Amino acid sequence: MQQVKHLLAAKGNAVYAVAPDAAVYDALQQMADKNVGALAVIRGDELVGIISERDYARKVVLKDRSSRETPVSEIMTPGVVTIGPDASVDDCMRLCTDNRLRHLPVLDGGRVVGMVSIGDLVKATISEQRETINQLESYIVG
């Protein structure tokens, strides 16, 4: 069973983050530039929240607010569910499903060391299942 640390090693463990006092517009620009759907919100070295495209849609667009004038802290999701690098992909899938999450920050010693998305987890699961199928087919064929 694959662990998060292996997933991060394969996909890269770049941490895309924004400060809580940054404008939502700047966070959106960074998400677009990095082709990601969420950013960690970090104050100093501490994870204080997460901001996603969904937060923007629901808390800025639908409320007719300005992304240039709204700080990230006003729309971010605080109290983020996190995982450690030794967590299994299955545990992450369960957390995402149970909590209706699309992104999980990875913390090691209280420091953000990466982020996994539900898409990353699905790809890893499919890859692992494909490998199992290939092994079984090889065994059957001889």
What residue ranges belong to the model's regions?
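Tandem CBS (Cystathionine beta-synthase) repeat/Bateman regulatory domains
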Residues: M1-G142
